[in-house]
Structure formats: structure tokens, C-alpha cells
Amino acid sequence: KRKSYAPAFAPTFAFRIYLLILALLFHLLAVGAVSLDNGDFGDRYYYRTEFSATEATKRFGVITDMRLDMHVTLFGERASDDGPSGGETVNPFESTTDPAATTAPADTSDTTEATTEPPAPIEYGDNVMDIDFAALAEKETNKDIKAAHEYFGSLTPTKKNAYTGMFKGKNLIFMTLEGFSYKTIDKDRTPILYKMATEGFVFNNYYNSLWGGSTATGEYTTMTGLFHNSAKCLEMSAKDNMYFAMGNQLSRIGYKTYAFHNHYYTYYGRDKSHPNFGYEFIAINHGLEGLTDCWPRSDYEMAVATLPYYINLKQPWHAYYMTVSGHANYSFMGNNMSKRHKDVVENLTCSDNVKAYHACQYEVELMLEELVRQLDEAGELENTVFVMNADHYPYALTDSELAELYGIPEAGIHKNFDLLRNGLILWSASMTEPVVVDKPCSAIDIIPTLSNLFGLEYDSRLFAGVDILSDTMPLVILNQDGDGSAWNWINAYGEYHSATKTFTPYPGFEASDEEIAAYVKPMNGVVQRKN
């Protein structure tokens, strides 16, 4: 006997219109709900003021993310007053210790006569250029550019200091290290890295934000002193005047400037960005030859292949490197460098994937060993400054593996700021003793700090970061993944987590809830305006 079925429902045209109206009403209701949230860096901020693909997807869903992305692509960012408010920041924290202090080498000079009068403080000038922002703002008709002139003109510049020009005229090797963590530095296994990390400038509270969650955004921040949350930021920067990128700054005063990368020339649009940063850019498929064809390629082999470009130059030089050996995957099957150096890490007491991570990062040690050896033989080691920073933490490791590597709890690991701690290496063989810096600082502070150390003419108001060695307190801005928070921040007084909207003062700093709230609101405005 044949079964009978009810006829399929055939929606009428009127019914389809009814569904469409319901969908539109639901969308308007959702948009209205977003508008009710006007907390600092809340849903309203990411819907109306700043577009972030990561935040939009988490907060509003894929379809709304695509719509907002298309709007920004076609028309640019939307101007809005929905961000955190500005106003004067009233600091409620009092301490007898200057939180901006830098621990400098002790003065060992002899004195022949005691004095009752303290020495007069040295008056250093500001790191500024002759830019009249008020005049520029007065003449400007474009409201966005006018607002930018007014903003930069309102900033207090950083001052020159005892370290200004310390490395003037020296060569510079500047590296962005793929997926690097300071946890892989070991006195016995990586002696060159250890020496550089402990005998130069020692930054005890250095952080690497995720920015846009990619190598491109981490590299952009390292190279510019600015930050961006789009993986297309390098390519997009090619149309901008990157006047203060180190390649441009140093080439203007007679340096020969190279940038090297042991991956493809066009990847992330570096073929467009890096020449605009002031470099002759050499990479795979564009001049970089002699490397083993494998994944990932060897950082050590890149050093061997590129040293001849600059080591015998009669003029000062600057070599920038973007490494790739530390790239995921972190396994002995999925990473050629991990497999190559498996014997170096076989005695480590950790899981295989964490061992593989340490093994591939061993390439950085071998690269530095080769650079130091050849520079020493050429008589240029003491005339060369090394600077190294990671693009991001090794986020391809699982949460349990990250907890193992960093020694922090797995639960809530992406809300833990210690996951973003890292090491900034700034070293020269000419330094006779380390300089310890306890201030919180981050990648946006590297270029201003180097500009001051090399005695370059720059305007400190035009960076998102500051010279770490100045008397200005850096503001660490942290973007994390996986917890719905974007612009967290840290300074000498405590840390703010945007997901919970809480500021936690560090020991020794106390204030009432009302004072903290009055402090946090304008500080969030500072963070928003730097973005």
C-alpha cells in the first residue's frame, strides 16, 4: 500500500514579504540593542566607531561582519563620537618612587671634593621637529585631517635624555622574529641569545600585543611605532609616507639599508611596503638565493647568504630581517627546522610539540652566532647594534602547550596578560654593563627608542609609542584573542581589562573606586585616540 504525504507548504508572495519584514525588524532590534551598550570598547564602539573583523565576528556574527567590512572597504572608517571620552586624566596614585624611572648604570667617577649643593639637573630638549600643528589645523578644511593636527598638537613630546645619541653612527641589525618567545632563551642552549638578553638593555616588563592577530600586524608595529588591526596593513601602508620607519630615517643620513626575508617576496605585500619603509628588499624569488627549499626555511642560511651585502661596506649600514624558521607547525613532522634540531632539545622535560617549538627557534641562535662571528672577524661587532622583537607569541600551540611553555594556568590563559610577556633584545658589544628597565613597554615603543639612541631628528608626538628611556611613562596596549576583549592596557600603576571593565592597581598604589573610575575613563580615551 502506497503511503500518502501531505502536500508541501508553498509560501505565498505575501508570506515572503512578511518574513522579510520580520527579518528587518529583528535586525533593527539588534542594532538598537547594540546602541544601548555605550561602555568603553563595548559593542557600540565596535559597531559604530572602529571596525575589527575579529571583534565584529565575535560580537555580531559573520553576516554583519561582512557588511561592516564592505562598508569600511568602500567608504573608510566611520567617524563617530561613541569612543571613550577624553578630558584631562587625573592620576589618583601617589608613590614616593617615580614609576617612570629607568635603572641606569651607576656613576663610578671619582670625586675629589665633597659638596653640600646637589648637582643642577641637566636640561634636555624635546624630541620634536619644527611642525606648527596649530597653523596646519587652522588652514585645514578636511575635518578628519584637522582633527589629527589638533590631536598631535595637544600631545606632550618626550624629552631627550642621557641615552640620546648613545649609538649615533653605529650599524644596526634589526629583527622581527617569527613566533618567538623569551621562554626559549637558555644560558646553556642559546648562549648568544642569553648574552644579548642579559648584558644589554634589559626590559623586565615588555609585552607583545596580538594587534590584528597576524605576523603582518606585529611586523608593522615593530617597524613603524604605530599599530594596525588588519592583516593587510603592510600592503596598505605602501601608499603612506612612512617617514619615521628606520629604513627611511637612516637612509636619509647616508646609511645603506637592506631588508631580508627567507619567505616569498610578495607575501603580505612586503614587496610594496618594505621599499616604502626605505629598504632595498631581498627575499625568496627576488634575489635571496642559496637557501634549502623546505618549510620553513633556515634563518641561519639566510644570515650566511645576506652578510656579503653589507659586512664590507665603507659606509654605515642597517640590515632588517624578518625570520621564518619559528613559524608553525610546531611538530617534528610538520616543521623542517624542528626536525633538523631535534637532538638539541631531546633532553628537555616537556611535551613533544613544545620541544619542537624550542627546536625550530634554535635557528635564531645559529643565525646570531654566524652574524656575531663574521662581524667580529671584520672588526665591526662593537660598531653594531642588535635589536630583536617577536611578531607575536606562538599562538599555534594549544592552550595546554602554551601553559606548559609559559608556566601559567591553562584555565583562562587568553585573559592572562603574562601570555603576552616577551623579551625585547637591545644590545651592542660596546656596552660595558647592562641597563635595567622596569617600566611596562611594548613594540610601539621600539622605533621612538631607537630614534633617540641613534640621535636622529624625529617628532615624538607622531608615534603611538614613546622612547622607553625618556621620563615619559609608556602605555602598553594589549589586544588579546578568544575572550572578547580588544584594547586592554597596562601602565606603571596597574592594568585594565576591557572584557570585565576592571582596573587592578599594582601593590603600593591605592585609590577609591570613584577615583579609579574617574582615572580609567580618560585613559580609555587615550588608548582609543592612539588607535
Where are these regions (language model features)?
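N-terminal secretory/membrane-targeting segments
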Residues: 1-170, 186-190
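Solvent-exposed soluble domains appended to multi-pass membrane proteins
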Residues: 141-531
